[in-house]
Amino acid sequence: MKPYKDQQIIIDDILNEFAYRNRIMLQLPTGAGKTAVFSFIAKRFIKDYKKKVLVLAHREELVNQTLATLRDIGVSCESIIASKKTLKHNANAYVGMIQTLKNRLRSNPLFVKEIELVICDEAHLDIFKEVFEYFPNAKILAVTATPSSLKKVNFTRCHRCKKEYDTITECCNYETY
């Protein structure tokens, strides 16, 4: 599996932005391959920085989809699920549901060590902001099709988005496959 040409441009742009910014929101339209894009970003981040990545989602099917995509592109990853009480710390990426991670972090703030990039899928949901405090030095990539629930909003001017993120990258003209 390889990214499409347009996806590769986005991947390169986001990784370049991380040299200057810590919190980035990436808006990609539905069908543009958000999971593939952020999975390739995770893979490159792991390779380039030798650091671990955490991917958070709010639904189990998104967790499973992300695990499958990361494994397909050769990333060693492990799920964070309620029934699993310990993690193999040799994985390069961890994927879990936001609520499960929040519960783990409350009881053990060191539950996930060495995380330098946190990726939030469907990041327009407010539940993700609570986790950021556990990773104050990590890069944050928030990926969504709809950064605001308001219709017809210019996302780069959305006050809530600008308050949370250093930059907002819109890919409105992105071709879907």
Predicted features along the sequence, with ranges:
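Conserved pre-motif I regulatory segment
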Residues: 1-27
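Alpha-helical elements of the RecA-like P-loop NTPase motor core of helicases
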Residues: 12, 64, 103, 129
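Walker A/P-loop
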Residues: 20-43, 144
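Residue-level preference for the first positions of well-ordered beta-strands
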Residues: 23-25, 52-54, 92-93, 117
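Conserved Walker A/P-loop ATP-binding site and its immediately adjacent core
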Residues: 35-40, 45-72
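Inter-Walker segment of RecA-like/P-loop motor cores
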Residues: 70-106
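SF2 helicase catalytic motif II
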Residues: 98-100, 107-149
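Interdomain hinge/linker at the junction between the two RecA-like core domains of SF2 helicases
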Residues: 154-177
